[in-house]
Amino acid sequence: MKNLILASTSTIYGASYLEYLLPDLAIHFKNCKSILFLPYARPGGISHNEYTQFVRLAFAKINIEIKGIHEFDNPIVAIEKAEGIFTGGGNTFLLVTQLYENKIMSVLENALKNGTPYLGTSAGSNICGLTMQTTNDMPIVYPPSFKTL
Protein backbone atom coordinates (compact mmCIF):
# COMPACT_ATOMS: atom_id res chain seq x y z
CA MET A 1 0.00 0.00 0.00
CA LYS A 2 1.26 3.48 -0.83
CA ASN A 3 2.18 5.75 2.08
CA LEU A 4 2.50 9.21 0.54
CA ILE A 5 2.23 12.87 1.52
CA LEU A 6 2.01 15.04 -1.59
CA ALA A 7 2.29 18.78 -1.01
CA SER A 8 1.97 21.47 -3.63
CA THR A 9 4.62 23.57 -1.88
CA SER A 10 7.33 23.27 0.73
CA THR A 11 6.95 26.78 2.11
CA ILE A 12 3.98 28.97 2.95
CA TYR A 13 4.07 32.71 3.47
CA GLY A 14 5.62 33.74 6.76
CA ALA A 15 6.89 30.26 7.64
CA SER A 16 10.22 28.49 7.27
CA TYR A 17 10.89 25.59 4.91
CA LEU A 18 8.47 22.68 5.61
CA GLU A 19 7.39 24.31 8.89
CA TYR A 20 3.68 23.88 8.22
CA LEU A 21 4.19 20.17 7.47
CA LEU A 22 6.58 19.20 10.28
CA PRO A 23 3.91 17.95 12.74
CA ASP A 24 2.47 15.67 10.05
CA LEU A 25 5.93 14.61 8.87
CA ALA A 26 6.92 13.59 12.40
CA ILE A 27 3.97 11.17 12.37
CA HIS A 28 4.40 10.08 8.75
CA PHE A 29 8.09 9.24 9.20
CA LYS A 30 7.81 8.07 12.83
CA ASN A 31 9.57 4.76 12.08
CA CYS A 32 12.42 6.39 10.15
CA LYS A 33 15.73 7.39 11.67
CA SER A 34 16.85 8.69 8.29
CA ILE A 35 15.25 9.71 5.01
CA LEU A 36 16.71 9.56 1.52
CA PHE A 37 16.45 12.96 -0.18
CA LEU A 38 16.28 13.34 -3.97
CA PRO A 39 17.53 16.88 -4.74
CA TYR A 40 17.36 16.48 -8.52
CA ALA A 41 14.80 19.24 -9.18
CA ARG A 42 17.30 21.87 -7.91
CA PRO A 43 15.21 25.01 -7.32
CA GLY A 44 16.99 28.09 -8.61
CA GLY A 45 19.80 25.87 -9.87
CA ILE A 46 21.32 25.30 -6.41
CA SER A 47 23.69 22.36 -6.03
CA HIS A 48 22.61 18.97 -4.74
CA ASN A 49 24.76 19.55 -1.64
CA GLU A 50 23.23 22.97 -0.92
CA TYR A 51 19.69 21.67 -1.35
CA THR A 52 20.35 18.63 0.83
CA GLN A 53 21.83 20.77 3.60
CA PHE A 54 18.76 23.03 3.48
CA VAL A 55 16.52 19.98 3.93
CA ARG A 56 18.73 18.62 6.74
CA LEU A 57 18.12 21.78 8.75
CA ALA A 58 14.35 21.40 8.45
CA PHE A 59 14.23 17.70 9.35
CA ALA A 60 16.63 18.20 12.27
CA LYS A 61 13.69 19.90 14.01
CA ILE A 62 11.95 16.51 14.17
CA ASN A 63 15.16 14.53 14.79
CA ILE A 64 15.36 12.82 11.40
CA GLU A 65 18.64 12.51 9.52
CA ILE A 66 18.70 13.35 5.81
CA LYS A 67 20.96 11.59 3.31
CA GLY A 68 21.18 12.89 -0.25
CA ILE A 69 20.92 10.29 -2.99
CA HIS A 70 23.91 11.91 -4.70
CA GLU A 71 26.04 10.91 -1.68
CA PHE A 72 25.64 7.20 -2.51
CA ASP A 73 27.69 5.23 -5.02
CA ASN A 74 24.59 3.35 -6.18
CA PRO A 75 21.29 5.28 -6.29
CA ILE A 76 19.30 2.10 -6.96
CA VAL A 77 20.51 0.47 -3.75
CA ALA A 78 19.98 3.75 -1.87
CA ILE A 79 16.29 3.75 -2.82
CA GLU A 80 15.86 0.04 -2.15
CA LYS A 81 17.30 0.41 1.36
CA ALA A 82 15.68 3.75 2.25
CA GLU A 83 13.54 3.93 5.39
CA GLY A 84 11.73 6.93 3.91
CA ILE A 85 12.07 9.09 0.80
CA PHE A 86 11.61 12.81 0.13
CA THR A 87 11.70 14.36 -3.34
CA GLY A 88 11.88 18.13 -3.18
CA GLY A 89 10.54 20.77 -5.49
CA GLY A 90 12.16 22.68 -8.30
CA ASN A 91 11.91 21.92 -12.00
CA THR A 92 9.85 18.84 -12.90
CA PHE A 93 11.54 18.45 -16.30
CA LEU A 94 14.97 18.36 -14.65
CA LEU A 95 13.75 15.98 -11.93
CA VAL A 96 12.22 13.49 -14.37
CA THR A 97 15.29 13.63 -16.62
CA GLN A 98 17.54 12.82 -13.66
CA LEU A 99 15.30 9.97 -12.50
CA TYR A 100 15.56 8.38 -15.96
CA GLU A 101 19.28 9.10 -16.41
CA ASN A 102 20.04 7.47 -13.05
CA LYS A 103 17.75 4.54 -13.95
CA ILE A 104 15.70 4.93 -10.78
CA MET A 105 12.19 5.84 -11.99
CA SER A 106 10.95 2.24 -11.78
CA VAL A 107 12.94 1.57 -8.59
CA LEU A 108 11.29 4.57 -6.94
CA GLU A 109 7.89 3.44 -8.20
CA ASN A 110 8.40 -0.02 -6.67
CA ALA A 111 9.53 1.42 -3.34
CA LEU A 112 6.42 3.59 -3.11
CA LYS A 113 4.09 0.76 -4.15
CA ASN A 114 5.65 -1.35 -1.39
CA GLY A 115 4.82 1.26 1.25
CA THR A 116 8.05 3.16 1.81
CA PRO A 117 6.95 6.45 3.44
CA TYR A 118 7.26 9.25 0.88
CA LEU A 119 7.04 13.02 0.85
CA GLY A 120 6.87 14.92 -2.41
CA THR A 121 6.71 18.69 -2.56
CA SER A 122 5.98 20.61 -5.76
CA ALA A 123 7.94 18.76 -8.49
CA GLY A 124 8.27 15.86 -6.05
CA SER A 125 4.49 15.59 -5.96
CA ASN A 126 4.13 16.12 -9.72
CA ILE A 127 5.95 12.85 -10.41
CA CYS A 128 3.40 10.84 -8.43
CA GLY A 129 0.86 10.96 -11.22
CA LEU A 130 0.85 8.83 -14.36
CA THR A 131 2.61 11.53 -16.36
CA MET A 132 4.19 14.92 -15.79
CA GLN A 133 2.20 16.48 -18.63
CA THR A 134 0.23 18.83 -16.39
CA THR A 135 3.28 20.61 -14.98
CA ASN A 136 3.65 24.29 -15.74
CA ASP A 137 7.43 24.23 -15.23
CA MET A 138 9.80 25.61 -17.85
CA PRO A 139 11.09 22.77 -20.09
CA ILE A 140 14.79 23.47 -19.45
CA VAL A 141 15.68 19.88 -20.39
CA TYR A 142 13.75 17.24 -22.29
CA PRO A 143 13.27 13.91 -20.47
CA PRO A 144 13.24 10.68 -22.48
CA SER A 145 9.62 10.14 -21.41
CA PHE A 146 6.85 12.10 -19.71
CA LYS A 147 5.71 8.91 -17.94
CA THR A 148 6.20 9.12 -14.19
CA LEU A 149 5.21 6.99 -11.21
Where are the predicted features?
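Short acidic (Asp/Glu) patches
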Residues: G68-D73, E101-I104, L108
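Class I SAM-dependent methyltransferase SAM-binding "motif I" and its flanking Rossmann-like core
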Residues: V96-Q98, M105-L149
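Short, conserved acidic/polar surface loops in the N-terminal third of protein domains
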Residues: H48, A78-E80, L95-L99, L130-T131
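Phosphate-centric recognition/catalysis
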Residues: N91
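Short, glycine/charged-enriched secondary-structure capping and boundary segments
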Residues: E19-L21, E50-Q53, L99-K103, Q133-N136
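N-terminal beta1-alpha1 cap of cysteine-dependent amidohydrolase-like domains
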Residues: M1-G88
